[in-house]
């Protein structure tokens, strides 16, 4: 699976063929050995050199990956409610593009630091967002993660942001 002269399909087939059922499951969900089934890390596959990695990264206002070095941190963007209020499709796509570029950069750097500045693990290329639930009740505790209460606005916002993330 590390042979770059093979096609992606061949490499994926080779990799999957080397994994046990337990290892396959461990790569698509949280690692319960970390003390909780509600975490954002895989177990990794040490015998194949596949490290534990952070599979969901907060992307509401930026790549929540702390800093990988002094003064080298992810960009911060306006939150979804502010972005939705702008009604500016190109800014939504640019936010997605920035997030996608930074996720790729953090992934390529090969590590992630926790809030204490210690190297924690690899950062993945998947994110918590965009959240497109409809903000209908101001008491909903996660309304700030939503672009607004209009279903069309939410759908267009999500489409532009995801397409921006995938362009990189």
What would you call each of these model-derived segments?
Residues 1-168:
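N-terminal beta-rich core of secreted/periplasmic extracellular enzymes
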């Amino acid at each position: 699976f590390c042979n770059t002269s093979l096609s992606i399909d061949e490499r994926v087939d080779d990799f999957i063929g080397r994994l046990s059922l337990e290892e396959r499951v461990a790569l698509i969900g949280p690692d319960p050995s970390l003390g909780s089934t509600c975490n954002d890390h895989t177990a990794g596959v040490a015998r194949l050199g596949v490290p534990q990695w952070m599979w969901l990264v907060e992307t509401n206002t930026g790549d929540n990956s702390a800093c990988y070095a002094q003064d080298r941190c992810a960009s911060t963007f306006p939150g979804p409610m502010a972005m939705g209020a702008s009604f500016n499709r190109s800014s939504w796509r640019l936010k997605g593009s920035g997030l996608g570029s930074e996720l790729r950069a953090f992934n390529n750097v090969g590590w992630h630091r926790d809030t204490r500045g210690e190297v924690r693990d690899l950062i993945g290329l998947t994110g918590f967002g965009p959240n497109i639930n409809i903000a209908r009740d101001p008491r909903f505790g996660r309304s700030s993660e939503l672009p607004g209460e209009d279903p069309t606005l939410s759908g267009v916002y999500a489409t532009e942001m995801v397409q921006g993330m995938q362009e990189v």
